Amino acid sequence: MGYHAGMSYDLIVIGGGPAGYVGAIRAAQLGKSVVCVERDRVGGTCLNWGCIPTKALLKNGEVYENIAKRAAEFGIQAEGVSVDWPAVIARSRAISDRLSGGIAFLFKKNKIDHVAGEARILAPGQVEVTDAEGATTLLEGKNILIATGARTREVPVFPFNGKTIIGSKEALTLPTLPSSMIVIGSGAIGTELSYVYHCFGTKVTLVEALPRILPNEDDDVCTAMERAFKKRGITCMAGAKVESLQDHGDSVTATITAKNGKTQEVTADVCLVAVGVVPVVPQAEGLQLTERGFIQVDDHYRTNLPGVYAAGDCIGGIMLAHTASYEAEQAVEGMFVEGHTPQKPTLVPGCTYCHPQVASVGKRERELKEAGVAYKVGKFPFQAIGRAVASGETEGFVKLLFGAEHGELLGAHIMGEGATELIATPELGMSAELTDADLNAMIYAHPTMAEAIHEAVLAADGRAIHA
């Protein structure tokens, strides 16, 4: 289409991440004129500094670990294997570049204009964009979708210096491979990067203030994951508090109070602080925010400003890339599809990409207990699954939670090889309101990791075949 002065759009999208670019494309598919404003690279944090580059590094790490540490297990002799760290980082960045370029292509294909710069909402229907040189452009449109995402939360007492105390973005482009690393926070980001650096030989100490690592997961997963990490040589300190960080220029010392009350000092080349994110909110006079600083929206993703909507991490809730995309699609269809009632995400899978992988959807067992829900548990280990044994990937299990009376699937928790792919089956089952009887009626291909799902269904009634 091509932007020109005085042009008015059906939709101005602020932010080109998983919410912004998906919302822009959906609006274009509906025949609307769209412009997307992005101050950095299209694709957002996920594609450029999160989901995608971490998965690239993870694959690099797994390849190295399998060759250097497990080759003999498969009858292969490998000697003199080493890491070319600059090449590792370069591959990760090249993948992000490729996919960001793919989104730029999709913008052209769908006739979406792209304006680079920082956006400021002057009034409903008016957005001012300031580019890197300070020049301003005025955009006008009938609707505005704010999809500005979130950024790494920086703890005031642990200020980033870009060298020894860093956030996740810096962890993806470290110039040299550190020999040791302290990671504060064991959510998905902290856990994944702990595993990645461990693969390459970095001595990792993972510190979590809550009683378990991966604290948002089911208790069985938390316990098993901590055991798996410790077996690999990753030091896990759950229920611990980092009292202070002392920067030495080329290293950093953390003073940590363990859960037993004892204080110890840990020194490492670098400390990664991964304790969550905070919303990024554009300048907009009168825009209503929540107490935590997120943009306040109603059930239709509308803000308090007329014609201004918001979706994705900037509105809080379940802050995942796939949730953001869903919310943006719902918001856009609510704007332009007559009779459409936008939906809020309710059934959202969560995935952690380390080894073994972790994936979950629905309720955790402790939630059912606290709510007084009558339930039954089906749990089955991968070590009894033929494909897992043949692949040398026997760690982990499938755990399914069913309603005691009707057998409805209430939650699914998978830890093991391919967990992030396997979770789609129970998610679909929950979405379709399938029962344990329905899931048992399916035929599961053999030999596959998915057979553990079938065995877990049977195990809920004490009928597992290979137990």
Language model segments and positions:
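Short hydrophobic core segments
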Residues: I12-I14, A119, L138-G149, V183-I184, ...
